Each structure stands twice: as C-alpha cells, then as structure tokens.
Amino acid sequence: MTRRYWNINLEEMLEAGVHFGHGTRKWNPRMAPYISAKRKGIHITNLTRTARSLSEACDLVFDAASRGKHFLIVGTKDKAADSVASAAIRARCHYVNKKWLGGMLTNWFTTETRLHKFRDLRAEQKTGRLNRLPKRDAAMLKRKLSHLQAYLGGIKYMTGLPDIVIIIDQQEEYTAIRECATLGIPTICLIDTNCDPDLADIPIPANDDAIASIRLILNKLVSAICEGRSSYIRNH
C-alpha cells in the first residue's frame, strides 16, 4: 500500500477539539499508548498518534476505492448522524445513522429481503400506485415505507456486504463491530479514551463526542475515498 500525503494538520485538529478525551475515571487502560497527558481531570489524546493512524486509514481507503471496493459508514448517535450522512453521500458510500438493526450484516439474507421490500414500496410510491389503494391500506404501507426509509435509507443501494466499515463511536456501535469481526470485514474506528483499540483493525484515537472532531476525521477519510474513486474511474 503506497503512503500518500493527506494534509493532516495538527493545528486544525486542535481547533476541532480532536484531542479532548473523557474524564480520567472513565478511561480504558488499553488506550494508554494513545494518551499524552491529563488536564483538569480529562485525558488528552496524543495528536501525533492520531495523525499517524488517520494517515494510515486514508491510505487504506484510497487503495480500496481505487480498486472499486465498497464502504459502509456507521454513526447513529445524534452528534454523529448528520455528519455521517453528508460524508457518505459525498463519497457515494452506504451509511447507517439512525439505528443499527441487529444482524444487519451477519443476517444479510433478512436485510436483503427488507431492502427488496423497501425498493418495491418506493417504486409504488413514485408511480402513484399507493395513492390508488384504499386509504387504510395506503396509510399502512406509507408508515412501513417511512420506517424503512429511516432505518435502511442509507443502505438502499447496497447489494452485498461492504468491504470496509468506518465506525464513529465504538461503544455505541458495539453490535456493528462484533458483526464485522464475525464476518472478517476490516473496520476503521474513531476511538475515544474510554474505548478498546484492539477491537478495531485501524483505530483512530480522537474525540468521538464533538461534532467538529467527527466531521474533521470523516472529511479526511471521504476525501481519500473520493480520490481513490477518481483513480478507479480513470483506469476503467
């Protein structure tokens, strides 16, 4: 894998609060190598380690995108949801930002069945067929469509398992991480000072609670994906 330059700036990360961890009482001792200091009862993340991990992750996603691989971005908590959707749409990635439905990957057959139902209902709505049904039936199907849009809208074009999964909050998305581990799907995880770096293939030590921090990390990753996709298009 070729190392590239991704313009990862320590000052920019400081401004975004990437270095702020959790209170020292909440820390995970396995995060010790990624922590540089304690300040006012809070652990401070070593941004040099963050930059190194982020650069490695950008190299990985660029390389994967340049070979036509598919990505899934997962972040369901309120502070991450909007950033996840906009980053994924920009880089044409699949995303989950509402709720991780257990078995979404490990029980792919069921997920695929739901996606087929979702696509059928969307098609019926677009053609106006739903409006020609009895009011009660139409209302029930519209509620069903709204529910599917909320939970599966970000993966509606997914036709198989992703090649790489990017996860914003390790503790919040523990089920997703376990499913990826079961299936052998590589994960890139933002890990705050209360997380376990050993659960991710590429852990990126960073503040996973601040919107600015989440957005900065995602922007770097999707920029690398977009560059990789451009390379893939040029060569095919």
From Swiss-Prot:
Its main location: plastid. GO terms for cellular component: chloroplast; mitochondrial small ribosomal subunit. Belongs to the universal ribosomal protein uS2 family. One of its GO terms (biological process) is translation. This is Small ribosomal subunit protein uS2c. The keyword Nucleotide-binding does not apply. Transmembrane segments: none annotated. PROSITE patterns: RIBOSOMAL_S2_1, RIBOSOMAL_S2_2. It comes from the Eukaryota. It holds the Pfam family Ribosomal_S2. Disulfide bonds: none annotated. InterPro entries: Ribosomal_uS2, Ribosomal_uS2_bac/mit/plastid, Ribosomal_uS2_CS, Ribosomal_uS2_flav_dom_sf. GO terms for molecular function: structural constituent of ribosome. Keywords: Chloroplast, Plastid, Ribonucleoprotein, Ribosomal protein. It is found in: Plastid, Chloroplast.
